[in-house]
């Protein structure tokens, strides 16, 4: 019984720590949103938030960063953007070796694989709408399935209650506003 009380108390401490980080970091995130890309890459800011704010374990962080790199590569390919060879090599390795071999993914693939699948389907639907010139708020939201996976990772690591309490911080990780998206789509 003492062990059970210990684990319950430990769980409450983790939730309290996550809530505190979320409350203090959301101000930190919003105050730096405009300079995020000037002072670091998106991967840098994602990693920093995964460590400092979301308190994710190393394997989960590596899996999420690898997934980010793969998603960015495929998005650049589809958009016809210039691709850096080193980035392509890293993403190929991540897609074929790093992601499936990651211990966090292996432990949770029954949850993560359907989420990745759904994110791809939502991205494809969004892309189809955008190519038809019908970009809208829904296509903007559907193209950001990566952040659904980040939130699910928080839930897997810290539990449902913690994910509910810190979800708004995950939402703020998305670096593009609806206005920026609509402007980009009108110029495409």
Residues of each region from the PLM?
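All-alpha prenyltransferase/terpene-synthase fold signal
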Residues: 1-188
């Amino acid at each position: 019984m003492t062990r059970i009380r210990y684990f319950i108390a430990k769980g409450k401490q983790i939730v309290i720590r996550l809530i505190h980080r979320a409350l203090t970091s959301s101000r930190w995130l919003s105050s730096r949103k405009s300079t995020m890309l000037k002072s670091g890459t998106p991967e840098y800011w994602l990693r920093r938030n995964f460590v400092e704010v979301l308190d994710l374990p190393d394997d989960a962080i590596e899996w999420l960063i690898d997934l980010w790199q793969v998603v960015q590569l495929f998005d650049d390919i589809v958009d016809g953007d210039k691709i850096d060879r080193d980035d392509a090599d890293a993403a190929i390795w991540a897609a074929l070796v790093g992601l499936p071999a990651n211990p966090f993914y292996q432990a949770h693939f029954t949850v993560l694989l359907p989420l990745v699948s759904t994110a791809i389907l939502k991205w494809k639907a969004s892309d189809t709408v955008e190519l038809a010139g019908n970009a809208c708020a829904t296509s903007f939201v559907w193209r950001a399935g990566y952040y659904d996976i980040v939130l699910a990772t928080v839930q897997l690591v810290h539990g449902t209650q913690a994910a509910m309490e810190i979800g708004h911080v995950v939402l703020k990780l998305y670096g593009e506003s609806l206005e920026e998206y609509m402007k980009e789509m009108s110029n495409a």
